[in-house]
Amino acid sequence: AANHTMPSVGGSFRVMQAASRIGAATKHAGVIGNGPWASLIRKALNDNGIEHIGQDRIDADSGFRLVLNDSERKTFVATYGAESQGNENTFDCVEPGEGDVVHISANTLMDHSASGIDAFLHRTSSDPTTRDYSIVLNPTNTLHMVSDHLLEDLVLVRPIWSCNRQEARTLADRLGVFVDDSLSMTVGGGFDDSMKALCN
């Protein structure tokens, strides 16, 4: 039996919370549903001065992830909700200006909301050399499930990839970049060299 439970808002919320705390005007463009989980999200956004500009769904609650932690390891059980039920128009509300940062979380790279990300990229970001705002992409461990078409479009807009070593290795595998494990135990060894090749 669990000693305690602690409901909290996850996903990209921590990034938005940090941005808001340093005084940046912060907006959330994801779909929010209707129900207890959606209410938790709306309250967290409101409490942190984050404006929700995305769509609302009244026929489904937002999804949740259950994290079971026994102090030695964590087990994740996830169910997707309203946030995954977007379409190609989902992110039409996003109009980045000069100097803005657009943060794309992994949850939007799958299911129906992925078409909204792809439409946004084609509408605003097709030429990274002339774009006057930044795209930060946090793929998490779902990168292996992103469609080939969307992954290609993401690579072409040259975002800032925010990922750990495991996620970077998955990205390298998807892009056919060889990771040299023979020097991986040395400081600045094979893995770091491979990641440099991946970035190039």
Which residues are covered by each model-predicted region?
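Glycine-rich phosphate/adenosyl-contacting loop at the front of the ribokinase-like
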Residues: 1-29, 36-43, 99
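Residue-level marker for the onset of beta-strands and adjacent loop->beta junctions
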Residues: 15, 62-65
